[in-house]
């Protein structure tokens, strides 16, 4: 039987699920928002980052993971949220919220500044264990997503695709988008070979993603 490329991550076992629950049940506090490499906090713990197109549901996912309704705040103004936001998850982890990309309305200087910061962060952050790239299940991988995936390849940063808003499409539509995403990921050597299907609204996949973050060492 031929194995499916980029299968969905399996449901965690009880012990792994508990490790994820305990990690995210602890304190999670906003540390700082940075716009320059010099302002990054000390690289003294493991960190994971979340990247995605604007309106992909990144803030909702971070809030669902941490069980806090307003920890990460979305901006409805194009180009406004151009900081790397750091959250301390207990004493051992940073959750890093990267600025949403893909705003056509954002002024060019802001976009260029963000691109420089992102490239510097991905290339120079030795404690970064994984990037979670969020893809809207309604739309699949877009050309603007390809840009960030290629940048992650070049930076040799392992990334894992997290499908968002899975409750907004039918099962048939979901399978079609998964096929498209799997085809796109075959071209990217830095892609972790499992996908996570989520819905922040319904809680789908949240335990699985918590477990993944907890097991990264």
Swiss-Prot record:
<keyword id="KW-0131">Cell cycle</keyword>
<keyword id="KW-0547">Nucleotide-binding</keyword>
<comment type="similarity">
    <text>Belongs to the TRAFAC class TrmE-Era-EngA-EngB-Septin-like GTPase superfamily. EngB GTPase family.</text>
</comment>
<keyword id="KW-0479">Metal-binding</keyword>
<feature type="binding site">
    <location>
        <position position="81"/>
    </location>
    <ligand>
        <name>Mg(2+)</name>
    </ligand>
</feature>
<dbReference type="InterPro" id="IPR019987">
    <property type="entry name" value="GTP-bd_ribosome_bio_YsxC"/>
</dbReference>
<feature type="binding site">
    <location>
        <position position="59"/>
    </location>
    <ligand>
        <name>Mg(2+)</name>
    </ligand>
</feature>
<feature type="domain" description="EngB-type G">
    <location>
        <begin position="44"/>
        <end position="217"/>
    </location>
</feature>
<feature type="binding site">
    <location>
        <begin position="164"/>
        <end position="167"/>
    </location>
    <ligand>
        <name>GTP</name>
    </ligand>
</feature>
<dbReference type="Pfam" id="PF01926">
    <property type="entry name" value="MMR_HSR1"/>
</dbReference>
<dbReference type="InterPro" id="IPR006073">
    <property type="entry name" value="GTP-bd"/>
</dbReference>
<keyword id="KW-0460">Magnesium</keyword>
<dbReference type="InterPro" id="IPR027417">
    <property type="entry name" value="P-loop_NTPase"/>
</dbReference>
<dbReference type="GO" id="GO:0000917">
    <property type="term" value="P:division septum assembly"/>
</dbReference>
<feature type="binding site">
    <location>
        <begin position="79"/>
        <end position="83"/>
    </location>
    <ligand>
        <name>GTP</name>
    </ligand>
</feature>
<dbReference type="GO" id="GO:0005829">
    <property type="term" value="C:cytosol"/>
</dbReference>
<protein>
    <recommendedName>
        <fullName>Probable GTP-binding protein EngB</fullName>
    </recommendedName>
</protein>
<comment type="function">
    <text>Necessary for normal cell division and for the maintenance of normal septation.</text>
</comment>
<keyword id="KW-0717">Septation</keyword>
<keyword id="KW-0132">Cell division</keyword>
<feature type="binding site">
    <location>
        <begin position="52"/>
        <end position="59"/>
    </location>
    <ligand>
        <name>GTP</name>
    </ligand>
</feature>
<dbReference type="GO" id="GO:0046872">
    <property type="term" value="F:metal ion binding"/>
</dbReference>
<dbReference type="GO" id="GO:0005525">
    <property type="term" value="F:GTP binding"/>
</dbReference>
<feature type="binding site">
    <location>
        <begin position="198"/>
        <end position="200"/>
    </location>
    <ligand>
        <name>GTP</name>
    </ligand>
</feature>
<keyword id="KW-0342">GTP-binding</keyword>
<feature type="binding site">
    <location>
        <begin position="97"/>
        <end position="100"/>
    </location>
    <ligand>
        <name>GTP</name>
    </ligand>
</feature>
<dbReference type="InterPro" id="IPR030393">
    <property type="entry name" value="G_ENGB_dom"/>
</dbReference>
């Amino acid at each position: 039987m031929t194995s499916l490329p980029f299968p969905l991550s399996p449901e965690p076992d009880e012990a792994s699920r508990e490790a994820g629950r305990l990690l995210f049940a602890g304190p999670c506090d906003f540390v700082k928002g940075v716009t320059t490499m010099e302002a990054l906090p000390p690289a003294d713990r493991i960190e994971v980052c979340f990247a995605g197109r604007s309106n992909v549901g990144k803030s909702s996912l971070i809030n669902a993971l941490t069980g806090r309704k307003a920890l990460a705040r979305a901006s409805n103004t194009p180009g406004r949220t151009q900081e790397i936001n750091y959250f301390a998850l207990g004493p051992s982890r940073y959750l890093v919220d990267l600025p949403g990309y893909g705003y056509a309305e954002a002024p060019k200087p802001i976009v260029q500044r963000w691109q420089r910061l992102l490239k510097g962060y991905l290339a120079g952050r030795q404690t970064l264990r994984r990037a979670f790239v969020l893809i809207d299940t309604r739309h699949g991988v877009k050309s603007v997503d390809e840009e960030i995936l290629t940048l992650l390849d070049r930076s040799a940063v392992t990334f894992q695709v997290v499908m968002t808003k899975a409750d907004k499409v039918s099962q048939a539509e979901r399978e079609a988008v998964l096929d498209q995403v799997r085809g796109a990921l075959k071209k990217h050597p830095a892609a972790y070979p499992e996908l996570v299907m989520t819905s922040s609204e319904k809680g789908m996949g949240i335990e699985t993603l918590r477990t993944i973050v907890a097991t990264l060492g």
